[in-house]
């Protein structure tokens, strides 16, 4: 098959969704398919070809002003027409492709354009949903970036914008609400017109059921490349001394990632952490609060800010425990998938799709409250054999559920069913 992967997030400068798209591309290439990533590139002009870590890539240039909401229109509605034309051109270029074409959109910015192109050339279109973009303009599913809520409406946006942007900027943004709601309608329309929609977890699938009929909705997890991770983690991390035992937190220092809960956890578990350093790999608005918590409790801490992806993997492979106190509806955390591949003992809060990865007491530990989290953390810090056993089983689960061959086979079956 010839598989076109439009994606607005792609390595090297991206988060988990971009790396998931790249892992999918490599897995499909390894199984003999022709794969081309199609990536919008702000600030460029025209169309350029290249390669991104062994994945053939077509970059589609566009420009967007820095004016709020006008910028979003330029990055989406105005871009979709040009991007759809490019996708359609690539799907019908027989000098490049001779087998049947499948268009698999990887994220929100490209999904409507993929549907437009698919309708134009008669190719099946699949859309992967990896976060909350179908029902939340900001894709977090959090009102004011703090409180989970089901969907955005006039009333919710009127309070969300001031909570998110501040009173003055929020008030100035209120006239943009009609555009925001219309933009959400475009996103949902793309999902309704797609040949199939893939949810990365049961949690996201449940959220999508009101938008997508059951026969078009499929739960297929993201891929984690075990072989590549093994090669990377064969080298120790450079940001922490080899003889220093440490507990690890990786992520944005924001409320949705549970950074505010980490302050409470450190206060309650400071005695248990005396033999360990708490390594915090990430940055964000709550960094100062965490620094104050470390100073008050006298817990040894290393703030690494942002680190490259390989170093993050090496840290996970060598830490005694990964803390994941996420406070939002995690779609399917790439950090947790990669932690399983690294045999990392994980302590997490069971939000969103996390239970699809971590089974409490089998390949990790789950705790629903801060006191319960602290209790399990103290237990695991004092039980190295238990930690090792959880890490071994985590790797086994990654091999059974998230390995490239396992997930790519599920996608092949779906693609073939749509081409019949």
Regions found by a protein language model. Give the residues of each.
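A conserved mid-protein helix/loop that constitutes part of the nucleotide-sugar donor-binding site
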Residues: 19, 23, 245, 249-268, ...
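A short, well-ordered alpha-helix in the C-terminal region of glycosyltransferases
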Residues: 386-401, 407-413
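Nucleotide-activated donor-binding/catalytic signature segment of Leloir-type glycosyltransferases, i.e.
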Residues: 289-310
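Conserved acidic donor-binding segment of nucleotide-sugar-dependent glycosyltransferases
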Residues: 360-371, 379-385
């Amino acid at each position: 098959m010839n598989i076109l992967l439009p994606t607005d997030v792609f390595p090297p400068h991206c988060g988990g969704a971009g790396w998931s798209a790249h892992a999918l591309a490599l897995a499909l290439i390894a199984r003999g398919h022709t794969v081309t990533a199609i990536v919008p590139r702000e600030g460029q002009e025209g169309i350029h070809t290249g390669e991104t870590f062994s994945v053939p890539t077509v970059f589609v240039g566009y420009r967007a002003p820095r004016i709020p909401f006008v910028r979003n229109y330029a990055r989406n509605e105005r871009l979709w027409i040009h991007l759809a034309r490019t996708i359609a051109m690539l799907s019908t270029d027989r000098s490049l492709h001779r087998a049947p074409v499948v268009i698999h959109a990887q994220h929100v910015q490209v999904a409507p354009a993929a549907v437009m192109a698919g309708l134009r050339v008669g190719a099946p279109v699949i859309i992967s949903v990896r976060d909350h973009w179908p029902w939340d303009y900001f894709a977090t599913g959090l009102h004011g970036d703090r409180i989970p809520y089901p969907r955005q409406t006039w009333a919710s946006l009127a309070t969300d914008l001031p909570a998110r942007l501040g009173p003055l900027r929020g008030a100035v943004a209120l006239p943009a609400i009609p555009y925001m709601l219309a933009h959400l309608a475009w996103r949902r329309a793309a999902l309704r017109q797609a040949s199939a929609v893939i949810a990365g977890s049961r949690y996201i699938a449940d959220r999508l059921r009101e938008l997508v009929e059951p026969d078009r909705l499929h739960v297929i997890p993201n891929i984690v490349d075990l072989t590549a991770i093994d090669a990377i983690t064969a080298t120790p991390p450079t940001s922490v001394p080899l003889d220093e035992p440490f507990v690890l937190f990786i992520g944005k220092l924001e409320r949705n990632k549970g950074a505010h809960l980490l302050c409470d956890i450190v206060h309650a578990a400071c005695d248990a952490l005396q033999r360990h350093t708490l390594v915090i790999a990430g940055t964000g608005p709550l960094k100062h609060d965490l620094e104050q918590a470390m100073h008050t409790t006298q817990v040894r801490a290393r703030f690494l800010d942002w680190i490259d992806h390989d170093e993050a993997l090496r840290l996970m492979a060598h830490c005694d425990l990964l803390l994941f106190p996420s406070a939002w509806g995690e779609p399917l955390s790439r950090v947790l998938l990669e932690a399983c591949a690294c045999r990392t003992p994980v302590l997490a809060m069971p939000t969103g799709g996390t239970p699809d990865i971590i089974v409490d007491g089998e390949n990790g530990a789950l705790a629903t409250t801060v006191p319960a989290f602290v209790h399990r953390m103290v237990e695991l810090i004092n039980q190295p054999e238990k930690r090792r056993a959880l890490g071994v089983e985590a790797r086994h689960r990654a091999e059974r559920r998230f390995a490239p061959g396992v997930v790519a086979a599920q996608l092949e079956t779906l693609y073939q069913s749509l081409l019949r």
